[in-house]
Structure formats: structure tokens, C-alpha cells
């Protein structure tokens, strides 16, 4: 009896869990600006937590991101509940047929990971699977290190000092 009850609880628990995904995404572009597109399809009803790891991503970047989903039937509808890039929260639209999310440019130190929380929910109690998807983009621009700014200021100071010295010698 205990085994049967435990088996039923295990089946019930898995019935409301969607597939949680971890996806590695390669950024492409130049050394100063890179971008990537990503997307997933959830085939199970329930809550999900998806993580996208972006590479290469060591360094400090100005990062912006977007998410979008469009589902006209309940089986194809994803509802976003939260999304974060390294703890920076994306602004999400409300639940509906068309949902989106975005992160305005923010300075973030890598490695970069986007975590998306949401759910696929529909009333049908049959074993028909879901087929709900969403997609997005992540863009990065290199941000100079503070040491780079210090070198720039030091260089400008040397140029200014040389200009003053010439000016005094010419007078």
C-alpha cells in the first residue's frame, strides 16, 4: 500500500513539472560587440526554470537582452514569471497571448547567465503534450577597464604637459 501511494505521489509530482533546461550559447561578432539568439520549446505542462550560459563571457560588458513568446492556444502559451541576467531583472509584460521581456543596457561582469522562470498551463487533462516556445537575444559591448581610463588620462596629462613646456620655451 505504501509503495502504491508513493508511486502515485511520484507520478503526480512529475505531472506538474515542466522540463528545466540548461543551454550553452555561443556569442558571435567582433571583439568589442557580440550577440546571440536562443530559444527553447517546452513539451510538458508546468513550471520551468531555464538557464542560458553565454560564452565567451569573461570580462565586463554593457549587456542588453530580450525575450518574446506568442501563443494563440493554451498548449503553445508560455507565461514568464521572472528573468535575470546575473541578478539583473528583465522587465516583463503581463501574461497574455503575446509576452515579452527586456533588459536595458546594464554593466555586468561575466560569466554571463540568463535564467528564465515561467510556466506552461492549460486546462486539458488528457495526456496531450504541450508545445510552447519562446526565443530571445543577448547583446554585449565591451566596457573598458578602469585601468584603461587611467592610462588614457595619464596620456592626456603627458600631452598637455608637453604642450605647456613647448609653449613656455617658445615665449
What is each PLM-predicted segment?
Residues 1-20, 135-164, 170:
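Short, threonine-centered small-residue motifs that mark membrane-proximal processing/anchoring sites
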Residues 19-142:
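Mature extracellular "passenger" or substrate-interacting domains of secreted, surface-exposed proteins
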